[in-house]
Amino acid sequence: FERFTVWFAKYVLPIVHSKKTILKFLSINDIDEQKKFYRDQWDSRRWRLLFGLASSRLVLKRFARQYSMFTYNKIKTVAVIYRKRLERNLNSVLAKNNFFLHYSLMGRYGEELPLYLQEKEYLHLKEKDLGSILSINTIDLSTYLKSQPANTFSKFNLSDIFEALSPSENDVVWEEIIRTAKNGAVVVYWNNLVKRLYPIQLSAYIKNNEEKAAVLQEKDRVFFYDSFHINTIIK
């Protein structure tokens, strides 16, 4: 996905907007001014055409995302949905402060950096013995969780991983999440193009925090997700 994003910034966007226009867009300090700039100077027919091509189902499936992420997605107008989500995001998040949008439009980060790349946080990570607390596994989540003892994890950050699962596979993963979670563990995840929630038969073990999720989604720098979810595991 990162390579695809750099390709978009390097080869597609310059066909639409000059570097001067891009830098202006990324320097605006006011939401209302940003909305006006997007409406009057950014949202051209050429922008819609090339954004539509670059974020079409065919292109994303071939170059940007794993093919399996589209197995259960039946939406054909993916590009239109993503453009509308971008516009929704620009109504509440300044592009200037959005490192993801900087990367998407420039092909690199500007002054705004993800936390782990900021000097203070980088030095904090550098001081830690990451080898003793971090492990990398290249197996699917269901298999990994089945290999772990019960009551192991306090946090789950699962991105939009449920997107690629069938309803039955989704249920199995949630059963394993509950089994391996400590009481009070927090599970966060996103829905993108496929709606996947925890199975209703497990609702006795799961508490929703929809209000907090809605507040945080308003601040989300990544525009293309549909919804953000926060669940607490109750045992």
Question: Residue ranges of each PLM-predicted region?
Answer:
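Class I S-adenosyl-L-methionine-dependent methyltransferase module
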Residues: 1-127
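A short acidic, Gly/Pro-enriched loop at the edge of an enzyme's catalytic core
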Residues: 139-157
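Flexible loop/turn segments at secondary-structure boundaries
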Residues: 143-146, 163-166, 195-199, 223
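A short SAM/SAH-binding and catalytic strip from SAM-dependent methyltransferases
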Residues: 153-168
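Conserved beta-strand signature within the Rossmann-like core of class I S-adenosyl-L-methionine
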Residues: 155-157, 183-195
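A short glycine-rich, Lys/Arg-flanked "PGG" loop and its adjoining helix->strand segment in the class I
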Residues: 169-183
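Core SAM-dependent methyltransferase catalytic element
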Residues: 209-235
